[in-house]
Structures are given as C-alpha cells and as structure tokens.
Amino acid sequence: MIKTSAIFLFLNYCLGKKVDMSMVVAKIDWRQLYTFASRQALLGFCFDGIERLAKEFSEELKQNPMERDLLMTWMGKAQQIRRQNIKVNVVASKLYSMLREDGLRCCILKGQGNALMYPNAYSRNPGI
C-alpha cells in the first residue's frame, strides 16, 4: 500500500512544485500509483509527473523502474486523455461560435475551464 504522504508529495510534484522525490521514487509501487490515479481520474496529470521524474530523477528511476507494460498502458491512457481534450475543446468552440452567430451572448460552463488551472491543460480528464 502506498503511504498517503507519498501520494500527496507526488501530487504536489505533478503540480510543478519543487519537491525532493528521490526517496519516493526509490520506494514507490508504480502499479498502486496507477490504480490510485485511475480511480481519481488523474492518469494524465500523474503521467506528466512521471515524464518530469524521468528528466529530474533518472538515477532513482533506474533503481526502481516502472514495468514496461504498465508504462505503455499509462502512456496510451495519457494520449487518449489528450485526444479527448482536443475534441471537447473543438466542440465547445463550435458551440460558442454557433451561439454567437445567432446573436446570443454566452459562456459555456464546462470543466475545460478548470483545465486551465493544470500545469498541462490537456492532461485533465475531460469527464466524458
């Protein structure tokens, strides 16, 4: 079981905060982190953190590498999330344009606005 403090440390790291992840990376159970991220709809967000870990803590990752099948699965899910976000953004933009052409002032209240608060807006699960 992953310690809650390790999860919150990792989430802070994913938010872009400068956190020493060396001890966490050395001991983390990647499958448990994947399960947690999946249940919380944070797969894309956490994958961005993992990509950052690969750059900043490569030596620690060599000591505790993620299994290839898990990495490929996670990468695939992250790509699906990015594609979904692109589609939702296009649809929201078209809807906005249609409403404006009809003379309506509008504001589309969709979760995509929340994505702007993420370090990478395309990593937020669009919830479709």
What are the roles of these predicted feature ranges?
Residues M1-N12:
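Charged, compositionally biased N-terminal leader segments and the immediate start
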Residues K3-T4, G16-K110:
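Helical scaffold of the NTase/Pol beta-like nucleotidyltransferase catalytic core
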Residues L99, A115-Y118:
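Conserved nucleotide-cofactor-binding alpha/beta core module
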